[in-house]
Amino acid sequence: MQSLAVDGYSRLAVIAALHATVRETVFEYELLDQNNETLGLLDSVSGGSIKNNSLATNANRTAKFSISDQGVNYLSDRIRPWMKLRMPDGGHASWPLGVFILSSPSRVIRSAGEHRKVEAYDQRLILLEDREEDRYVITSGTNFVTAINTILDSAGVTEHAIIATDKMLPASRDWKAGTPKLRIINDLLGSINYSPLNFSSAGIALSRPYQRPSERAPGYEYAATDDSILSPDLSIELDSFGVANKWVATVSEADRLPLTSVYTNVEPSSPTSTVSRGRTIVDFRSVDAADQESLDAIVARIAFEASQLYEKVELETALMPHHENNEVVQVTYPRAGISAKYTEHKWSLPLQAGAGMKHTLRRVVTV
């Protein structure tokens, strides 16, 4: 999550202001050029909304804006909204809410005037639309993150903070002409067991080694307390599917030795294990992995993510601007018997003071 200690205010001071009975919130809209350099502030955005979906295969973060300004170049300009929370001393604590590429707007003409409705997307769109002209080859011995950064730079995405690794490609890899650059990047990230590429609220490309939600500390807690910003209404759903209990993954390439990794659920307490079911359900797949260590980690990850049910919780809070992508939060709600960590799958934030922010959370229940 974004830091709550911003603009000279401490985390505790900002939390107190976020949880105050009365809050004063304003939104600003920063106009950027195609290099994310500031052009100025837009004073003609009358509203909009932002949504984030951590499981989306295209843009994770999308937005809608209503704009009356005619000075926007919708082909190249970008918008970075900011939420500003008024503090007790009269100053503001501010957070960026994403960098958005604009689509062609639709014009709406009414008696009160004309405005444009604009849909917008995070910078993953750049990497989806930019494709390789020829077969793209990365030679063996190339560092994975170096290869990824090279692709990002070639697409004009120069602000990136991919966690470094010492892993090298064990064999040359290639992708056919026309492959989106995002696909190549995520293939490389998957080979070293990193999370898919995403963009921060500030517009920086990010990825880090994958961690199970149980291994991650919550970024924030939503609790039903006296100063709670949590709505009293929420929904809970247990999404159950049949799952495998044995996973086999292989790496087979012409110029390297084959690799195999097997993971079997034999836990007697698990209702879907080979012991409990009395039969074996195999998930077999071919994957790309840098080495045996990476392959073992990938198979363990596949098994963990498959051997579970998802308890989905939908809740609403006051506007909380510090959420990023795929966060872990703690939810404490005694009336529903909830006190657990959840991964935030989706959130939506209206660009309107006093509105509610909706969160869709998932809790892993291993089976």
Please report, for each region that a protein language model flagged, where it lies by residue.
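Acidic, small/polar-enriched beta strand-loop surface segments
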Residues: M1-N36, N186, G190, S207, ...
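Short beta-strand-centered interaction patches in the first periplasmic/extracellular domains
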Residues: Q2, A93, R110-L127, I163-V243
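Extracellular/virion structural assembly segments
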Residues: R23, D33-R80, I126-D130, T139-T142, ...
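Short amphipathic beta-strand and strand-loop transition segments with alternating hydrophobic
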Residues: S46-L55, S103-I109, W347-P350
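Amphipathic, non-transmembrane alpha-helical segments in extracytoplasmic/periplasmic proteins
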Residues: N58, A63-F65, A120, D134-H160, ...
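Well-ordered beta-strand positions in beta-sheet-rich domains
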Residues: S94-V99, K117, T260, S339-T343, ...
